[in-house]
Amino acid sequence: RLARSVSAAESNRARASRVGVGIGAGVAVAGLVAGSVVARRRFLTNTANAARDLDPGFREPPVSPLVSTGPGSLVDPRGVGREGARYVGTATTGDDVRFVTGADPIADPIRVFVGLDAGASVQQRVDLAMAELRRTGAFDRSHLVIQAPAGTGYANATPVDVVELLSRGDCASVAVGYGLLPSFLSLNRVDLARHTQQALIEAIAAECDSRSERSAGSGRFGRPRLLLYGESLG
């Protein structure tokens, strides 16, 4: 009887030890998971904040009223982010057109950029982009490039440069951002990117249709030729 009691006590202690080890392991795993979640959130926040910081060379707003954040612009320079500031700050000028092509420019190109922080919703950002396009006279140009930027807001200026040069400046371009993280970290924003671009294209198409109706019978073409371009996740 004593032997059985001792054996039972030892069995209970072993069982309790295993339970304790299991609980300890569970707590440790939960701690690791929680720690990794916090670390990931901190990393994403820091990455997004870095994308908001402007490069030293683009901290001063452009001097042209034909680009976003320039004189008279409705876009706050603080709302375009690093990539947006680069995009509007490197617009081709009439002098560039003359230097590269040898031809006289028709006009200085228009560039519109609206970043993620410029509005609380897709509709607000698209509405702001449309207001900028109207303000700058973008719908009076022969070409309008609609660009879907990458996850960071990066809008590739190279294809836009080409259109600006070939049209001798008689063009406009627009991009609306939907995030601040690299595309491989923005896969959860695919629907937002698609919704943003769809809303922008539909708004521009409606404006062009309206202008075409108003100019019908006037003997002139009342809308620009639309060109679409997407970068990475865009």
Show which residues each predicted segment covers.
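Hydrophobic helices that insert into or interface with lipid environments
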Residues: 1-77
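Soluble catalytic regions of membrane-associated enzymes that act on cell-envelope
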Residues: 65-234
